[in-house]
């Protein structure tokens, strides 16, 4: 995923957190902020220190990033969102990560509707 698709700065993370528009399941929490002027979505990924050592945290982030990349054509383009991994997300197989993220993205309404794809 290109850098233009990522949220990196702490101030940008805080703006999304402050919207308090969150959706969660047992493995992930997603915060969403609408940004209609934006040409494409941006994502921030946070994996806390409760998830293993640095190797395990980076492994988890890579799996989240790969899942988002696979969902990219289906996602709304006018949002910033943060994905926060809960400790239960540690060591999940790729198909489970993708399934759990799909569930929480549906709750958050991050998938573009069929009508907007046809326009």
Swiss-Prot record:
Keyword rRNA-binding appears in the UniProt entry: no
Catalytic activity as recorded in UniProt: Endonucleolytic cleavage of RNA, removing 5'-extranucleotides from tRNA precursor
Key word RNA-binding present: yes
EC number(s) on file: 3.1.26.5
Cellular component terms per the entry's GO annotation: ribonuclease P complex
Annotated GO biological process: tRNA 5'-leader removal
GO MF: 3'-tRNA processing endoribonuclease activity; ribonuclease P activity; tRNA binding
Assigned keywords, A-Z: Endonuclease, Hydrolase, Nuclease, RNA-binding, tRNA processing
UniProt superkingdom: Bacteria
Pfam families, A to Z: Ribonuclease_P
EC category: hydrolase
Assembly and oligomerization: Consists of a catalytic RNA component (M1 or rnpB) and a protein subunit.
Protein family (similarity comment): Belongs to the RnpA family.
NCBIfam families xref list: rnpA
Function: RNaseP catalyzes the removal of the 5'-leader sequence from pre-tRNA to produce the mature 5'-terminus. It can also cleave other RNA substrates such as 4.5S RNA. The protein component plays an auxiliary but essential role in vivo by binding to the 5'-leader sequence and broadening the substrate specificity of the ribozyme.
UniProt protein name: Ribonuclease P protein component
